[in-house]
Regions:
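Single, function-defining residue in the core of a domain
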Residues: 1-171
Length: 171
């Protein structure tokens, strides 16, 4: 979920720290109105297409999404407001019976082109591969059940299991 405090901390650190988070809440904007409604009112920046991998109870399929982007100010806490870019990717023409893929993302990066927005969508899509890798590591390899009392043994076992999880994930 989006954590406004995290966004403010990234801004206040004094050195670059890019973030991309899923927008969990349809926040009220300083001038009134709601975040998602305002961004969805924008003309699409363009359209992207990618292959959505198979998931639990879902076959792989091609997804086409319209991309809408807007730089916007969100109300902060005592530290004031924060400027973010909201990217909303909405699937068009989803197959019958399939839930359309829609992602609402917030980032501190500025987005001025479809290419920049597409790069952020690719970052978000990579997250699923990372989550699948760790799911295989935890549930398939059962690394949390390892009872190795020594740090070196644990590191050696994890190194082996990570290769196994990587190979299973790549199959």
């Amino acid at each position: 979920s989006d954590i406004l405090e995290l966004m403010l901390k990234a801004r206040d650190l004094g050195y670059p720290a890019d973030y991309l988070v899923r927008s969990q809440h349809n926040r009220v904007l300083p001038g009134g109105g709601k975040l998602w409604d305002q961004v969805m009112a924008q003309t699409p920046l363009g359209r992207i297409r990618f292959m959505l991998p198979a998931g639990r109870g879902r076959k792989s399929r091609t997804v086409e999404q319209d991309i809408r982007v807007q730089r916007i100010s969100l109300k902060g806490n005592a530290k004031g407001s924060i400027e973010v870019t909201c990217v909303i990717a909405t699937e068009i023409n989803a197959p019958e019976g399939a839930k359309p893929v829609q992602w609402r993302l917030l980032t501190n990066r500025e987005v001025n082109s479809l290419e920049q927005a597409s790069e952020l969508i690719d970052w978000y899509r990579a997250r699923w591969e990372i989550e699948l890798f760790f799911l295989i590591l935890k549930e398939g390899c059962r690394v949390e059940r390892l009872q190795l009392g020594d740090k070196d043994r644990l590191e050696s076992a994890l190194a082996i299991y990570m290769v196994i999880a990587w190979r299973i994930n790549g199959v």
